[in-house]
Amino acid sequence: MKRLTALLAAALICTGTVLATSADAEAVSCRRGYFCVWTHANFDGMKIEHSGDDHWWEGNMNNQDSSWANHGVSGPGVKDHVKIYDGRELTGDVTLCLAPGQEISYNGGANDKGGSHTWASRC
């Protein structure tokens, strides 16, 4: 009986490891140091990657954003949050503000409203 319990425990540990590995394989495709935005929910459709500010989202992304990921690098004095504005040239309301490492697969209030973004020290 003790041997069966040990085998079951080992099997559960192995299964947990496999599940963790599977989850890592499905991570959002956005390079380290970048803010990424997609035209469809769940990180699908056309993707644009930004390592800096963009005060004028091009026509194929302007007001077409549906999912977002902030893979910016954090550190002392580093602007690592991303503020998304509904107008170009950082005008209008902030539709979203993403903290470092934050990924949003869909947000109905911000969907198709982005026009520009800037890196900031905080939200």
Model-based region annotation:
Residues 2-9, 14-17, 21-123:
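Compact beta-sheet-dominated domain cores in extracellular/mature segments
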